[in-house]
Amino acid sequence: MSKSIEKFPKELVSPIAQLHSLVEKNSKLHIKELFAAEQDRFQNYSVKFDQLVFDYSKHRITKSVLEQLFALAKTKQLTHWIERLFSQDKVNCTEQRAAMHWALRLPSEYSKFPELTKQVHTQLQRMYVLVEKIHAGQYRGATGEVIQDVVNIGVGGSDLGPQMVTHALCDFKVKTAKPLNVHFVSTMDGSQLSDLLHQLRPETTLFIISSKSFGTIDTLSNAQTVRQWLEKALGKHDRVVKSHFIGVSTKAEKMTEWGIAPENQLLLWDWVGGRYSLWSCIGFPIALTIGIDGFQQLLAGAHAVDEHFQNTNFEQNIPVLMALLGIWNNNFLNIQTHAVLPYDGRLKYFAAYLQQLEMESNGKSVQRDGQKVELDTCPIVWGEVGPNAQHAFYQLLHQGTQAVSCDFIAPIQRYNADHFTYVENAEALIEQHHLALSNCLAQSRLLAFGNEALDSAELKNLPIYKQYEGNQPSSTLLLKELNPYSLGMLIALYEHKVFVQSVIWNINPFDQWGVEKGKQIADQLLPILNGAQNDLSALDASTRGLIKILLGKVDG
């Protein structure tokens, strides 16, 4: 391909063809050679913005590769699509909806969309009123006791985002009139509820039913179970449901029908996708944990990235760079799996959150025009807290046969702020933080440079099974500190990365039709498992055989 391309002027050859040519030309190129050839490579391939640093120097890229990636973005009209996203255009083409999660973090004084801003802040203010009442011990259950446990019942975006943020910001938990604990329940099999309910008192427990449609069977089955638990203990009175449930949904009428009091109904909108909804009242558990000021800082961090994304040239635009690096790795270097490796235990749920954000958004095979995609779309996204992952799957990263790209994430500072309750252990804890940071840097270095990172004397007689190929690309994201503002920034970076990649692949990142049909088929099978129907003739042999075992008609 490269020879034929050289016959034509560069401007007449598509960026995709140019990138394929660069792959062929640099097929043997190793990351260590890129660093050897460019002494100031870190300065040339890193970006500092606000409270974070993005280092992408350990990718298998050159200036020529970046130029063609930027050209590709321009041919796909990325600037136009960014403008469309930050308008009220219906960029969700299959559902004919806008995608305005960015509006959820607009400052109250924002003048460009006054009605939209007012709509959002009206609901946020209603949420803040409930948060203040609960924190002050003024919100009471049906028997008059103060609420001390809040259980969020949701699934997908109504669970993953709030749980991830609540856990990540545990250091910023606010003091309340009485100790307040926040819990999360999502699984439809009831196992989480079974484990949790025996630890709680009905009199002092409040449940949040968090469901955009207020029709998700996973969530409503759990909600019905806890309703029965409450009514068994406190009696079947309207005030039990009205005092012990808060609903968050687009469907006010369904919440009312279920029995939730109007003052306990918090609304969101169809233009908010579930996996983009933690900034809305779906984030109620977050606000309960870190307080109103903390929640507003989370929104402010995300809004700062929204502004950066809209107003920064591609060369310094972190979400654009993250996205284009992913395109290069996935579509040109054939690296089809991506590991997210935070070196901070508080980010325990971050990889799981990104799995939904990235794979549910961009796990598509049909373009916006209905044609099959021309390039592979979303890679497999996975990961774990880095220090734990070192003892689990880093063997594969270092010496396996799979090419894997990685994101390393770490805070620069920890254990040095006044609000930490464990400040008396600060010195030992700071040493532990430095231990985590040293491992983060060591692993990214070894993945990139391989044997080059080893001592030459050690390498001289090292058996091959102890050697390292390296050349595994990675980015490193350093946060000044993991706090509400910086976490808001981090999440928004990945949201916009996803959008940029969807533009390059020409797919809709705001629908999820792939998950719908499975739910419908489950509805068809449920009557058979419940004994209300026994005709299995329409089913495949495997499903028939499994159902017979489940019903005890044959031995398993």
Swiss-Prot record:
Keywords recorded for this protein, A-Z: Cytoplasm, Gluconeogenesis, Glycolysis, Isomerase
One term under GO cellular component: cytosol
UniProt pathway: Carbohydrate biosynthesis; gluconeogenesis; Carbohydrate degradation; glycolysis; D-glyceraldehyde 3-phosphate and glycerone phosphate from D-glucose: step 2/4
An annotated Gene Ontology molecular function: monosaccharide binding
Catalytic residues as annotated in Swiss-Prot or TrEMBL: 360, 391, 519
Subcellular localization, as worded in the UniProt entry: Cytoplasm
Reaction(s) this enzyme catalyzes, per UniProt: alpha-D-glucose 6-phosphate = beta-D-fructose 6-phosphate
Protein name per its UniProtKB record: Glucose-6-phosphate isomerase
Organism listed in the record: Acinetobacter baumannii (strain SDF)
